Structures are given as structure tokens and as C-alpha cells.
Swiss-Prot record:
PANTHER family reported for this sequence: NICKEL INSERTION PROTEIN-RELATED, PYRIDINIUM-3,5-BISTHIOCARBOXYLIC ACID MONONUCLEOTIDE NICKEL INSERTION PROTEIN
Ranges of biased composition (kind: Basic residues): 79-88
UniProt GO MF annotations: lyase activity; nickel cation binding
Name of the protein this chain belongs to: Putative nickel insertion protein
Organism: Rippkaea orientalis (strain PCC 8801 / RF-1) (Cyanothece sp. (strain PCC 8801))
């Protein structure tokens, strides 16, 4: 049977909550402590756990207690750390993980999570991931949270991880760069990278941290309802603050109900359509960019014949149901249409996974589409991320097609034994 897990995040997700849910699920804290010693930073922190109550519900709280604390000038209202006494660049962290002799799967997951987090922070600040120097990635507690979570999932033998929609939270929080709105910019970038479904539960606290978002965005195969599974254990990981709802991350652990069948994933999408016959064609390109920037999943046009024998176009926009109002506003504002049709449809999708590939010309992302899980997983398509390849081509003065082929060849070389 294929072992799977589902992260249910009604009150958000953070690294320490992930650790708590894993320990509550049966991962020995002593195992995590011994494995984490291989990072050779054990003198900088103490890892311990306790049982706590959140709105009357018993859960496990894992603490990453720093040996040396820097006093903060700005006490934070949020539940998680943003001020740390030790910062590191991404290459230093990657070198630390690679040299730690961790279990192979734990090592690869940890590297992928940190890379994804650095890409998000780099995008926020306009710098390359390798040059990111900020507290969230380099802090001891973030290292322990991420590597510890990957160790725990590996110890449980999880072959596929899924995640629920995420609450946005609200308010503001103090961070290394001053006061930031919640969700903080890095979290939004991470959500954007996987088009994570989000919602507001009207709680004005930081509910999703960059560390928690990076873990989910990197490791989860799909966001939404729980997959078909036989539930064997549910681990409860406690957050730090009391909230109007139990501040608990629930980790469902079990086996796939249909391990021999190809797992089909589906989601709800909105389709917007309008015919236009009196718009300057130059405006269409601008409308495309505006809609995609607003969160549209896809935008396209078709040539059509309209009344009075006029040539026109059918503008179609595909977006999540939550983005309908935003996309409609752009269409009304930027085009000459007087009406828009929209409908909700089911869309069957493949599982999508993003991996970071390092080549001689730099780092590029690769998107992998697959069906099934565990031993029944079949990779159907692999594509190099266009924007990343363009950037590498411009920097290296190499043809774009050559860069794309190098990225794909590198991925196939690294994964040929897994396919």
C-alpha cells in the first residue's frame, strides 16, 4: 500500500507546527535530535516538546530554543519567529545539509525547500537566490524546522504529501526588514509559485510563515480536499498563540484507498468569455498581461464572425473562482465589452512538481507532470521553466534552445534511475 499524508491547516502552518504534528504522529523526538546533530549546530539550540492545550484540544508543541537570544527592539504580535541571532546565505545552508550525511530523501527534500524559500525571498528583494541574506532562511530555528520536518516525513515513510487550502491571516508583523503586512511578501510569492488556494478566516494574525509555506509549497503534490485514503493516525501540532479557533496543524497519515489506480486530481475553475469587435488590437496584449498579473490561470483569444458580418474575437479567461471579480473588473475597465459570461467547471489535472536543477550556467526550475503515487507514479511530461531559461541564456549569451536542452538533459541524468 502507498503511504500518504495530508496537512490540514485551519489555523495556518509554520515549521514548529509541522514538527509538533510529526512528533505527535509517532516520530521519536530523540531520532530527530540525533539526526539533526549531523548539521553540527547543536550548540546553538535546544530541541524539546511538551503537551499543550489549544481551545481545549490536546496537541504537541515542539520548541526550538536558541542558546543565545538577541533582544528584539520590536516585540512581534505573531506566533512565529522573525528575529534571529544568526543569519546565513543559502549556499552555506546547502553545504551544511549536503555534508551532514542525512538520509537521502530527507536531504533532497530539505535542499528543495530551502531553494524554494530563497527563490521567493530573492524575488521579493530583486536578487538571485544565492545572494539572499536574510533571517528567515539563515536562522537556526528555520533550519531545524525544515530539516526536522523532512526527517520526520521520511521516517514515517510518506510517499506523497497533500495540503489543504491556506488561511491568509491579517494585520502586520515585525520582521528583519521592518513592519510587513500579513501575509508577508515571501509567503505570497510562494503561494503564487504553486497557485495555492487561499481564503480569509477573519483572524488578524500571521497564520502562515515563510518556513511553513515553503515546506507545503515544495513538498505537497496538490492543494485542496483530502485525497481518498484510509486514515491510520492524525498528529496534532500546536502553534504558539491562542486563537479564536484551535491553533493546531493536523497531519493525517494513512494509506491510499486505490493504490492500483491512477489518481486523478480535479479542481474548480471559472471560465469567463466575451466577444469583442470594436477594440484596437494593440490593447489585447496589454489586457493579457493585466489579467495574468491579476492571477488568471490562462488567457486566450479566438477569431470569430459576429453580427453584421463583423470580424471579432472571443476573449476567454480561466481563473480560480476567487479571482472572478478581479478578472471581470480588468475586462470591463480595459476593453469595450458590455457583458461577460462566466461559469464554474471541473478541471482534471495532473500532479505537478517543481524541482531546482543546477547546471554549469546556473539554476533553473523544471516542472514535472505525473499521475499516480508511490510505485504507481508515472511521469508524463517534463518541461524547463521558460523564464529561468531565458535568464540563463541572456547571462551566458547562449541560444535559448541550447539552455533548455541542457536543463532537461541535466534533469534526466539526475532522475533516470527514478523513472
Amino acid at each position: 500500500m502507498t503511504k500518504i499524508a495530508y496537512l490540514e491547516c485551519p489555523s495556518g502552518i509554520a515549521g514548529d507546527m509541522c514538527l509538533g504534528s510529526l512528533v505527535d504522529s509517532g516520530v521519536p523526538l530523540e531520532y530527530l535530535i540525533e539526526q539533526l546533530k549531523k548539521l553540527e549546530i547543536q550548540d546553538e539550540y535546544r530541541l524539546w516538546s511538551e503537551k499543550v492545550y489549544r481551545q481545549g484540544q490536546l496537541a504537541t508543541k515542539v520548541h526550538v530554543e536558541l542558546v543565545e537570544h538577541d533582544p528584539s527592539n520590536h516585540p512581534s504580535q505573531n506566533t512565529h519567529h522573525h528575529h534571529h541571532h544568526h543569519t546565513r546565505h543559502l549556499p552555506e545552508i546547502e553545504s551544511m545539509i549536503k555534508g551532514a550525511n542525512l538520509p537521502p530523501q530527507s536531504r533532497e527534500w530539505s535542499l528543495a525547500v530551502f531553494r524554494q524559500l530563497a527563490i521567493a525571498e530573492g524575488a521579493v528583494h530583486g536578487i538571485e537566490p544565492e545572494k539572499v541574506h536574510f533571517h528567515e532562511v539563515g536562522a537556526i530555528d528555520a533550519i531545524i524546522d525544515i530539516v526536522g520536518t523532512c526527517l520526520g516525513l521520511d521516517w514515517l515513510g510518506i510517499e506523497a504529501l497533500y495540503c489543504s487550502e491556506m488561511p491568509t491571516g491579517g494585520g502586520t508583523v515585525w520582521a528583519a526588514h521592518g513592519r510587513l503586512p500579513v501575509p508577508v511578501p515571501a509567503v505570497i510569492k510562494l503561494w503564487e509559485s504553486r497557485q495555492v488556494p487561499v481564503y480569509s478566516n477573519n483572524i488578524n494574525k500571521e497564520l502562515v510563515t515563510p518556513t511553513g509555506a515553503a515546506i507545503a509549497v515544495t513538498l505537497a503534490k496538490h492543494f485542496g480536499s483530502p485525497p481518498a485514503m484510509k486514515v491510520q493516525k492524525i498528529g496534532l501540532g500546536a502553534g504558539s498563540n491562542e486563537l479564536p479557533i484551535p491553533n493546531i496543524l493536523r497531519l493525517w497519515i494513512g494509506e491510499s484507498n486505490n493504490p492500483d489506480q491512477v489518481q486523478q486530481l480535479s479542481e474548480k475553475i471559472a471560465v469567463l468569455e466575451t466577444q469583442i469587435d470594436d477594440l484596437n488590437p494593440q490593447v489585447i496584449g496589454y489586457v493579457f498581461e493585466a489579467l495574468l498579473a491579476a492571477g488568471a490561470l490562462d488567457v486566450f483569444t479566438q477569431a470569430i464572425g459576429m453580427k453584421k458580418s463583423r470580424p471579432g474575437i472571443l476573449l476567454t479567461v480561466i481563473c480560480t473562482p476567487e479571482k472572478v471579480a478581479d478578472c471581470q473588473n480588468i475586462i470591463f475597465k480595459e476593453t469595450t465589452t458590455l457583458g461577460i459570461r462566466h461559469r464554474i467547471q471541473n478541471r482534471s489535472i495532473l500532479q505537478r512538481e517543481i524541482q531546482q536543477i543546477t547546471t554549469d550556467y546556473g539554476v533553473a526550475r523544471v516542472k514535472i507532470a505525473s499521475q499516480g503515487i508511490g510505485d504507481n507514479k508515472t511521469i508524463l511530461n517534463v518541461q524547463a521553466e521558460y523564464e529561468d531559461c531565458v535568464e540563463l541564456a541572456l547571462k551566458s549569451n547562449q541560444p535559448l534552445q541550447i539552455i533548455q536542452q541542457i536543463v532537461l538533459n541535466t534533469w534526466y541524468h539526475q532522475n533516470c534511475l527514478k523513472i
